[in-house]
């Protein structure tokens, strides 16, 4: 079961930059509200799955922060160096969390 939760978490986390692009490309308040609901839904989902079932508090905080870094990276793409740097951090941290999660998946 821990493998299913791990891959779902990574998949959902990977959707944040895509959703940020949608937010940037449309100036609609409905999209803004939807993004806020998705962010809070992600935090609740990550907290329930990772903390309650797996007791991985550090990975939970890292995953939530990584989602925000990717989100902010796409939002800042028009400010040249900051958006690119945030997206590079997002990719490196994402690989690190995936490797660490797979390494310790049996402890979940």
From Swiss-Prot:
Keywords: Host membrane, Membrane, Transmembrane, Transmembrane helix
Subcellular location: Host membrane
Principal cellular location given in the protein's record: host cell
Membrane topology note: Multi-pass membrane protein
Stretches that traverse the bilayer: 11-31, 33-53, 69-89
Keyword rRNA-binding: no
The organism's place on the tree of life at top rank: Viruses
GO CC annotation terms, alphabetical: host cell membrane; membrane
Name of this chain's protein: Putative transmembrane protein ORF108
Species for this entry: Acidianus filamentous virus 1 (isolate United States/Yellowstone) (AFV-1)
